[in-house]
Amino acid sequence: MMIAIGLFLLAGLAEIAGGYLVWLWLRESKPLWYGLAGGLTLIIYGVIPAFQAFPSFGRVYAAYGGVFIILAVLWGWLVDKKTPDLYDWAGAVICLAGVSVMLWAPRG
């Protein structure tokens, strides 16, 4: 379980960091290397989920989406300096609960 969580966190950070670098390049006129580094980071993000032990691609990506939401809220707060409100946190917690059900519910 800890490896799965670690891979989800690593994928999330790679996706958000890569997207953020591309954002800075295109929206805030940062140098081209921001965009290139962002693109490379996004490629790495695309590979990371393949190391998950779960057999279903769809389940892994759906569950990852919930983790991504939590990380995106945290990134916005810590890096972009946009304080999340109660509804941001409530929505993120609901998503995390859904992820837990999807991944670890007993199945027969």
Curated annotation (Swiss-Prot):
The membrane spanning regions, by residue number, are: 3-23, 31-51, 60-80, 86-106
> Where is this protein found?
Cell membrane
Give the Pfam families listed for this entry.
UPF0060
Q: Does the keyword Disulfide bond apply?
A: no
Q: What would be one Gene Ontology cellular-component term for the protein?
A: plasma membrane
Membrane topology term reads: Multi-pass membrane protein
Chief subcellular location equals membrane
Q: Which UniProt keywords apply?
A: Cell membrane, Membrane, Transmembrane, Transmembrane helix
Extract the PANTHER family matched here: UPF0060 MEMBRANE PROTEIN YNFA
What family does this chain come from, according to its entry?
Belongs to the UPF0060 family.
Protein name (Swiss-Prot/TrEMBL) = UPF0060 membrane protein BLi00854/BL03049
Name its species.
Answer: Bacillus licheniformis (strain ATCC 14580 / DSM 13 / JCM 2505 / CCUG 7422 / NBRC 12200 / NCIMB 9375 / NCTC 10341 / NRRL NRS-1264 / Gibson 46)
